[in-house]
Structures are given as C-alpha cells and as structure tokens.
C-alpha cells in the first residue's frame, strides 16, 4: 500500500515548528560553515515535517548538525541507495578504526547517520515500506559483518587461528540473523536476534597457549556483541538479543554445527521451528552458513504434512495473549489482537504445515510468502489482499511510533502530541480517524487469524461444542457396552456390535499401544469427530469399516490426525470418498500424504488440463536441485498420487464423465513421462555425452516414447500399466561426445533402462507405473530401444498381424518432434498397406479366439455358451464375447482393412474417434457405429466402477445382455468368426 503524503501539520504540532526551527538555528550558530539560508524551500518543509514527527531526528540534528547538512548536500535524502552502497559506507567506517573503542564509536556514528536518513525518507514518503525495511536490514548486516571482519584477525593475533579437527582448515564463525533481521524486515528501532555457530571443534594454532575453538569463538562473540550493543555517548548500533540460541540465556554463547544439529534434532521445540523459518546468514562464513542451514532444514520443514504446527502456534498465541492481558498491552500493535504477529502466524502456519513438500513456501519475507499462498491456492486473493494491506498499515504505524524517540515499542502512544505525530505520519487529520482505520485493519486480521489458527474446540455462539463431544464417552469406554451399542444403533449403525468390535480392535492395536502421550491425546480428540461425521452418512458401518484401517495406518504420525481434527471439511471429504471407493481408502492409507489434497475442495474436484498439469510438474521439479535424484523421484510420485486422487474424486462426485477421466489420467502419464525422459536424458548425457545422428549432428534427444494399448488409445484407468516402445534415430556406430564415450546404441539402451528405473522403482511413495515393453520389435527377446529404421524393417517384414493391430493404437507420447513425425509416417505406411481381407479376417479371428480361450470365463466358454446371458453367471467385461476386446478387435480390423483407401482412419488411435471416422466414410452403418461407441463407453464405465471398488472387471451376465448380442451381431456381419 502507499500512504498519502503528509499534509499540513495539525494544530497540536504547529507549536513544534517554531521550537524546532529555533533549535536548529541555535545548533548551527557555532558552525559558520553551515548555512541554513542555503536550504531549499523543499528542505525546510521536509525538516519541519520530520522534526515535528521525530524527537530523535531533532535531537540528532541538534547534536550533529553537520551530519544533517552533509546528507542534504550529498542528495542522499532524495534517492534510494544503489545495491552495495550502504555496505560500502559501513565498511569504510569500520576499516578506518584503529582500536575497538574507535570501531564502536565509528559504527554508532554511522548508524545514527543512516537512521536519520531512513526516518527522513520514511516520514516524507520518499521511501516505501520495503525500502525502509531493506535499508535497516542492510545496515544491520553490514554493521555485524564489518565488525566481525575487523575483530576476527585481531582475535586470531591474540589467541591463534582456530583450526578444524576434521578438515584441518581455519574456522570462521557463522552468524545467523533471526526474526525480522533474517527476513529483511527490520523496523526503525529493532533489536537483532542472533545465533552464533562454528563448523568444527578443534584448537587454535600459532600462539604459545592455544584455545579450544569453543572458547575462541565464545570470546569473539562477546567482543562482537560489545561492539554493537552497549549504549555509549554516541548511542548504540543495535540491541543484540541472543536468547533464541539453544537453551536460551543458560546455553553456550556459541555452538559447533554438530552441537546445533544435535540440539534441534533431539530437543528443538515448536517455537524454535517457527523462529528458524526466517534464519539467514548475516555475517561470517557464508558458505559454511549455507551448510548449517541445510543441516537444520529437516528440523524446520517436515517432509510430511505437519498440522501439529497449528497447535504449537495456537499455544504460542495463548501465551502471548496471557502476557498482553497481564501487562495491559491490548494497544500493542505487534502482540495484541489483530496485530503484526497474527499476520506472521498465518503465513508461518502454512509454511510449517506445507513447506516440507512445497518448496515455494521455504522463503523468509512475509509479503513474498503471502504472494505464494495466493499463487499456490492456499488462500483466496481477497484474503491475501486484506492481510497484505493490513500488515503494511501496521508496519507503517510501527515505524511512526518508533521514529518519535528511537525506542523499541509497538504500544500506541497515550499523549496527545505523540498521537498527533502518528496520525500525521500515517496521513490522517486527527487521531480518531487514524484509530478507526487501525481498528478496522486489526479486526480484519484477527478474523482471518481465527479462521486459520482457531481451535476447533472453541465454543460457538450458543456455548455448545461444535462436534464430537457426545461420542467421547463411547471412545473412552466411560459407558458400558450395552449403552454404547444403543447409542450407535440410535445414530444409524446397522451392526453396532461390529462397530464396537472395530473400535476395540483399533484401541488395542500394536500401533496405538506404542503411541506417545501426545499422539494418544490427538487420537482421543479425533475419534469422536470421526464418529460424529460417520453417522451423517447413509451407511456409517461401511464408513467405519473403510476409515479405521486408515486411522490405524497413520496413527503413529499423529500430525495427520491433527490435520483432520483441524479441518472438519477435509474429514467430511475423506469419509465421503472412502464410503464411495475402497480403492481410494486404500490409497490414502498407503500414502497418507494424500490427505493434503482433501484440504482444498475446489482443487480436489477440479483436476487441471494437460498444459496446466505439465506446467505444475515442471515448476515443482525446478525447485529441486538437479543432483537430488531422491527428491525428484519423490516429487514425481507425490504428483502422480495427488492428481490420481483428484481424478478419482472428480469421477465419484460426477464432475468428470468417463471419457474425461481417461483423458486426465493419460495427460497425467504424459506429463510424468516428459519429465522422466528429461531427467534420464540429463543423467545419461552427464555420464557419457550426447549421441550423434548419421549426419554428424547431435541428438537432442533424437528419442521418442511410443504409447500402445490404453496409453496410446487415451483410455488409461486407475492402476493401468503403461505399454511403451522406445525409438531413436541415432547412428548406432557413432560414439557419444562425453568423457566416457559409448556408441549410440548403448547410449539409448542405457537411456531406456534409466527411464524404466525412474518409472518402476519402489520408494516410500510407491512406484510411478508398471511398464510393459513386450510390444517392442521381437517382444521380450528384442532390443530395448530400436532405431527408427530397424523398427520400420521389422514392421514391414517380420511383424505378425496382431502386432499391426497393436500399432493401430500406437501414439507418440513425448520426445523429439522430428523423430515423432518420422514415426507417424512409418505407422501410416505400415498400417495403410493393401491387405488380403479374407486372410486378415482369419488371422484377427484366430487371435481373438486364443485370447477368449485363455482369458475368458470358463463357465460360459468365454461368453459363447448357451448360459452366457443367465442371471448369476459371471461376465468378464473385457475378455468375454461381446465385450470390450471384441469391439477393439473390430476397430483394429477395420483400420487394417480399409485405411489403404481411407487413410483418414489412421489419424486417430482411440476407438471412439476411429468409429466416428468409419461412420463418416460410410464403411460402417451409422447405427452400428453409434451402438459400438455407446456400448464401449458403457463397458469402460463399468470397468472403472469395478476398479474403484477394488473388484475385478466381472459382473452379472444378465447385465448388458442386449448390448453384447448386438456386438456379436456386428462381429459376424464383418465376417469375423
């Protein structure tokens, strides 16, 4: 937000103008070189404004008028600093010092100069909030680091150079800036929260009496604090607060990296995670500091969803509220209701919960985090806009308060003069107008805070608990079994005894018996909510049957229970999906990270289109270092699991029809294959260099992945494997251009192996896909990757008719466009050749008969016996006569038989559009083509439903009886047997 320029001074402040002008006149009286008459009218006006608002600036101008004149003369009050300019000034000041006393004096004078400049630009609105905070933070960074760089060599001269035991290298200290300093958000009168560390234990060298590294850096840290913190006649540089270090004031001033890691791993508390979010290396050894932060990252950002963070933030807020009440600090704009801290808590709640998986949230500045929360869909744009504007208003107010006397306070002033100063700086004519606006923003912030952080057990307006309380006695066995059974029955359970047995089984399971106290408390809070929502369903028995195994699976990671406790909507969606599909229940039990997807209802039931899918996955992977294969593989699997769930949820809810379900699942696989190929290509090229084509040009990649079967035909279902074929156009004899060259044939074989490895390897998040490569030339005995020429020769000279049938559904998925276009030409040429139709019908019929005999229902002779349509007899939707495969074979027969004269048939690889093409070309009666399309979709829809119920694709033979007879009729009319 931009504040209005300060207008005329209010009446309350007018007397100060005359006083201040007299003060500055008196101050320059003894300095003939300083001429007030040389000031421009603008400078006079600005001085009147700034001095009226800030007693600190006035007193500094009185003590050091030359400092103000120099700033005016240099133009520094009218412009923002160039990058590095402020640091350069502080460095020159520090380096000029000849003693520690002079260092301290120089730094304090430099700080006063910058403070005057920053407040001047802030009050006159020449600097926006971001510039003010950045300049203050840059000032702190420079002061800390330049003081350290001045002190370190002198400390080494006195006590020796610290050497690491392990590396044998000189050691430097690492200074972490926490809180607002770490986030580059310092206010006008901030203290600075620091943590000191050093890489390795060891001793100093180069002096007679060596020091332990710990002692060396402790003494150095003390000298650094002394250079910055004490108040002298020149003021102070920054107040230094070291209480955020391990063990607080009772802990060692400096710790080794190992000790820091051990502490946070074993004893780190929730509030320390919150504090560490903003940690930044502000001084000392930057490279070592980056290593330290990488070591501590797992402590801050958990790799699973961590809704326990909300509990911790809620507890912290309660402690703050108690302190606010105790000290009468309701008017504190930082800690009071709707204050700065609440905005920070909102942002950091999302960071702590989701930051382990969403790397875009691993950043420090609050406004950038808010922008990410909006961009990634965690918070609506309107909410973020209010939080941003309210936060900026509070920060401007904070600066106006602190500018008065350079005091670290966020309390609204009580005196009339200071109130007038704050209102004036914020652009209001009077205190009441300002205060009304302030309370508006505090109200909005507090409302949003309660939406995110509020305790679900808070009472509603009528003083009743929201959900679950009536089920606590049953879960905690505070009532006898008869009463518990009666409560369940009255609530809608058909089998209350079985429900009690299931709950007892959960209660006594090994996983729950070994739970820690906090986990058990979370479970006890969750189960009553689960029961309260289960009885809202038509079949609560089924809900309990499917959800309790999931609860048992995630109970040891009780943060997932917190997620569902904190988010009643997510729990409601979980029960709905599990009631509808045991497949979904099993997926979530196996991969609890999917619970994250239940949080956003709009996102859950609206999967993205193909371009958005590809873009989202690309963006996720770009946030992961290129050499972190484990994280890349996990990210791919998380992506697949999450989007598969979204598709299934959309299908169950009726938001997606069958054809769209297959489209989305196919697009998902294509997006994943595209990134898997890119990863495998980078890894293989890094090892061996790039392969070459026969003309000497480099392949980039000169490789394509062909999808066959359901993948090629855009008909993927839940749990489908991928039928793939790999093709390249490299010169098999030419070598790659890397340090470890191999011939192109070997290169592409290794590339193919790498792709399969990335797709099929089991990790904690499962595998991406099962891959079937048996449709490649010569099947399982053939080369893993074929050259395009070899593929064409095989298809022309050696392939069986069933392989040409499979080629009808073959489609380029990802890879080199040039090779893909060449493949399409080969496919059209092979499939479009003239054929002996009688021979073709015989071969297609023979292959279909073999499949029916081997895979169909034995009891009905694969749907051809007299009992094939009887109720109670099984019908295999896919394999039996009149089913899916019959329709697929008819489509493939038609494509092979007629594409020579009607090449448009080959434009498509999916059965629906090929049938449409056959109808338009009058190769099949319209009524038959329409019937086959509708029956095919009905069969596939039934198969999808069976899959979501974790059942085989077998239904009662009485279903689809008429449709199957019609399919068999058309089969016969095509001359197939």
Curated annotation (Swiss-Prot):
Looking up Pfam families in the UniProt record yields:
GlnD_UR_UTase, GlnE
Show the segment(s) annotated as Adenylyl transferase: 468-977
The record's keywords, sorted A to Z, are: ATP-binding, Magnesium, Multifunctional enzyme, Nucleotide-binding, Nucleotidyltransferase, Transferase
The reaction(s) annotated as catalysed by this protein in its Swiss-Prot or TrEMBL entry are: [glutamine synthetase]-O(4)-(5'-adenylyl)-L-tyrosine + phosphate = [glutamine synthetase]-L-tyrosine + ADP; [glutamine synthetase]-L-tyrosine + ATP = [glutamine synthetase]-O(4)-(5'-adenylyl)-L-tyrosine + diphosphate
Q: Which CDD domains match?
A: NT_GlnE_GlnD_like
Function in brief: Involved in the regulation of glutamine synthetase GlnA, a key enzyme in the process to assimilate ammonia. When cellular nitrogen levels are high, the C-terminal adenylyl transferase (AT) inactivates GlnA by covalent transfer of an adenylyl group from ATP to specific tyrosine residue of GlnA, thus reducing its activity. Conversely, when nitrogen levels are low, the N-terminal adenylyl removase (AR) activates GlnA by removing the adenylyl group by phosphorolysis, increasing its activity.
Listed name of the protein: Bifunctional glutamine synthetase adenylyltransferase/adenylyl-removing enzyme
Its encoding gene is what?
Answer: glnE
């Amino acid at each position: 937000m931009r504040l209005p320029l300060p207008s005329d001074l209010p009446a309350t402040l007018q007397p100060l103008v005359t006083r201040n002008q007299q003060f500055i006149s008196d101050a320059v009286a003894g300095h003939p070189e300083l001429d007030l008459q040389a000031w421009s009218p603008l400078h006079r006006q600005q001085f009147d404004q700034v001095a009226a608002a800030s007693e600190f600036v006035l007193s500094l101008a009185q003590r050091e008028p030359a400092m103000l004149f120099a700033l005016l003369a240099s133009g520094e009050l009218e412009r923002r600093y160039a990058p590095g300019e402020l640091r350069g000034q502080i460095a020159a000041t520090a380096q000029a010092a000849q003693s520690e006393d002079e260092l301290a004096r120089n730094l304090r004078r430099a700080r006063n100069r910058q403070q005057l400049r920053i407040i001047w630009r802030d009050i006159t609105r020449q600097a926006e909030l971001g510039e003010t905070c950045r300049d203050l933070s840059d000032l702190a960074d420079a002061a800390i680091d330049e003081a350290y760089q001045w002190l370190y060599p002198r400390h080494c001269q006195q006590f020796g150079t610290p050497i690491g035991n392990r590396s044998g290298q000189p050691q430097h200290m690492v200074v972490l800036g926490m809180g607002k300093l770490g986030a580059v958000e310092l206010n006008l009168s901030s203290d600075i929260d620091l943590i000191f560390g050093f890489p390795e234990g060891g001793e100093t060298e180069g002096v007679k009496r060596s020091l332990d590294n710990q002692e060396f850096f402790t003494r150095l840290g003390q000298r650094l604090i002394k250079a910055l913190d004490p108040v002298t006649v020149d003021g102070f540089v920054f107040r230094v607060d070291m209480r955020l270090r391990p063990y607080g004031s009772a802990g060692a001033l400096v710790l080794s990296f190992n000790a820091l890691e051990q502490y946070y791993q074993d004893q780190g508390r929730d509030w320390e995670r919150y504090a560490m979010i903003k940690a930044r290396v502000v001084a000392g050894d930057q490279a070592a500091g980056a290593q330290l932060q990488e070591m501590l990252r797992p402590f801050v950002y958990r790799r699973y969803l961590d809704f326990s963070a909300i509990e911790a933030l809620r507890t912290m807020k309660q402690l703050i509220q108690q302190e606010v009440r105790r000290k009468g600090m309701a008017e504190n704009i930082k800690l009071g209701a709707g204050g700065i801290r609440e905005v920070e808590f909102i942002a950091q709640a999302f960071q702590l919960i989701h930051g382990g998986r969403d790397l875009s949230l691993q950043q420090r500045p609050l406004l950038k985090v808010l922008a990410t929360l909006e961009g990634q869909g965690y918070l609506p744009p309107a909410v973020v806009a209010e939080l941003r504007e309210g936060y900026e208003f509070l920060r401007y107010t904070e600066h106006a308060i602190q500018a008065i006397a350079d005091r670290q306070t966020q309390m609204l002033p009580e005196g009339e003069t200071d109130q007038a100063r704050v209102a004036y700086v914020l652009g209001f004519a009077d205190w009441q107008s300002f205060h009304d606006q302030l309370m508006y923003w505090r109200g909005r912030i507090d409302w949003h805070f309660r939406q995110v952080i509020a305790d679900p057990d808070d009472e509603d307006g009528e003083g009743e608990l929201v959900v679950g309380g009536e089920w606590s006695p049953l879960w905690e066995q505070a009532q006898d079994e008869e009463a518990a059974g009666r409560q369940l029955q009255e609530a809608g359970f058909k089998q209350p005894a079985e429900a009690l047995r299931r709950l007892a089984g959960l209660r006594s399971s090994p996983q729950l018996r070994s739970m820690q106290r906090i986990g058990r408390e979370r479970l006890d809070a969750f189960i009553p909510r689960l029961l309260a929502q289960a009885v809202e369903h038509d079949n609560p028995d089924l809900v309990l049957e499917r959800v309790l195994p999931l609860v048992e699976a995630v109970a040891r990671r009780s943060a997932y229970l917190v997620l569902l406790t904190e988010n009643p909507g997510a729990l409601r969606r979980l029960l709905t999906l599990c009631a509808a599909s045991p497949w979904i229940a099993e997926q979530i039990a196996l991969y609890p990270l999917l619970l994250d997807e239940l949080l956003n209802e709009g996102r859950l039931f609206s999967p993205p289109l193909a371009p958005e899918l590809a873009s989202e996955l690309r963006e996720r992977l770009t946030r992961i270092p290129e050499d972190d294969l484990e994280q890349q593989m996990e990210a791919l699997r998380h992506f697949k699991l999450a989007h598969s769930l979204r598709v299934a949820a959309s299908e169950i809810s009726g938001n997606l029809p069958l054809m769209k379900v297959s489209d989305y699942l196919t697009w998902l696989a294509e997006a994943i294959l595209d990134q898997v190929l890119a990863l495998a290509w980078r890894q293989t090229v890094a090892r061996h260099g790039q392969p070459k084509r026969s003309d000497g040009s480099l392949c980039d990649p000169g490789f394509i992945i062909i999808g066959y079967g359901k993948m090629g035909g855009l008909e993927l279902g839940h749990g489908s494997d991928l039928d793939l074929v790999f093709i390249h156009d490299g010169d098999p004899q030419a070598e790659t251009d890397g340090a470890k060259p191999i011939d192109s044939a070997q290169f592409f074989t290794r590339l193919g192996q790498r792709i399969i490895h990335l797709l099929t390897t089991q990790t904690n998040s499962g595998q991406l896909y099962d891959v079937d490569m048996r449709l490649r030339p010569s099947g399982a005995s053939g080369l893993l990757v074929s050259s395009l020429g070899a593929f064409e020769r095989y298809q022309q000279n050696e392939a069986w008719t069933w392989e040409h049938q499979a080629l009808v559904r073959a489609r380029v998925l990802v890879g080199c466009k040039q090779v893909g276009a060449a493949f399409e030409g080969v496919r059209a040429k092979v499939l479009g050749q003239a054929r002996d139709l009688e021979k073709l019908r015989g071969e297609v019929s023979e292959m279909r008969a073999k499949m029916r005999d081997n895979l169909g229902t034995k009891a009905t002779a694969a749907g051809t016996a007299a009992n094939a349509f009887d109720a109670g007899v099984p019908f295999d939707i896919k394999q039996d006569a009149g089913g899916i495969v019959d329709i697929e074979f008819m489509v493939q027969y038609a494509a092979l038989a007629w594409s020579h004269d009607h090449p448009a048939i080959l434009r498509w690889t999916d059965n629906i559009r090929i049938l449409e093409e056959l109808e338009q070309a009058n190769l099949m009666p319209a009524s038959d083509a329409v019937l086959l399309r509708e029956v095919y979709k009905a069969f596939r829809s039934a198969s999808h439903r069976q899959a979501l119920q974790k059942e085989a694709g077998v239904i009662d033979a009485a279903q689809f009886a008429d449709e199957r007879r019609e399919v068999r009729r058309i089969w016969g009319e095509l001359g197939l047997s």
